[in-house]
Amino acid sequence: AIPVVGNHEFQSVAKGKPRNVSIQWRPQFTLPVEKELAPVLHETVYTVDYQDIRIIVINSNEQLESQTKYIEKQLKDCKSRWKIVTCHHSVFSPAKGRNFQFARDHWKPIFDKYGVDLVLNGHDHTYARGHVPIRTADGKETDDLGTVYVTSVSGPKQYKLDLNQIKSYNVDGYRRDNAAEQTQFFQVVTVENNSLVYVAYTALGEEYDRAVITKDFNSGRKKLTSENSK
């Protein structure tokens, strides 16, 4: 399991006191301690190498600026062929009233620079998948893939999509591929040879969304194939 800390894992012991991660969090898991980070981030920010995949877990609740250098170092030093980043708050939020501008301003450029393949988010109680294509030096959009971004929801609490807000991310190069509301999901990610396959299923086990990233490991170029099952 790759636990990702969310906003509900943080609490304050009294009004006006700083929030800290829940006392239930650390006893439940045995997670890496990144000693270069502040103690408040220990066991909530970490990196796991699983076979040929590097998974970087970010704490999107606390000390965001101090994590930026950590993220870049983990990506710069990465020897794995695939890079996945996950945090609770959505980089490209599809829900009304949600906006994680810091991530788009500070983290997305790093994801672009080091070719992150997939970013997995939650928090918004709705579903959206999109991607950022590679652009040429003069800003022209190409058919090559940069990063796939997913925001998903597994619980029964649901919010509505904000299509206008999603459209506003065009200035960041984001292109929506699929979206849904009032639906619970779980995802399966499979890596085999030069392909990463992402599939979203409804709570009833029906396939809803599929994306395949195909990568040329020599050039680093990637292509995206999307299938909207519904």
Where is each model-derived feature located?
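Short, catalytically relevant binding-site loops at active-site mouths
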Residues: 91-92, 125-127
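Active-site glycine-centered loops adjacent to acidic/histidine catalytic or metal-binding residues
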Residues: 6-7, 88, 122-123
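Catalytic-core region of carbohydrate-active enzymes that cleave or remodel glycosidic bonds
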Residues: 1, 108-122, 126, 183
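Active-site-proximal segments of metal-dependent phosphoesterases and phosphodiesterases across multiple
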Residues: 78-119, 139-142, 168-169
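Extracytoplasmic low-complexity repetitive segments enriched in small/polar residues
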Residues: 67-68, 119, 208-210
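Extended active-site neighborhood of metal-dependent phosphoesterases/phosphodiesterases
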Residues: 1-79, 106, 128-180, 185-188
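Hydrophobic anchor at the start of a short beta-strand
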Residues: 1, 83, 196
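A short C-terminal boundary segment appended to hydrolase-like catalytic domains
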Residues: 160-162, 167-230
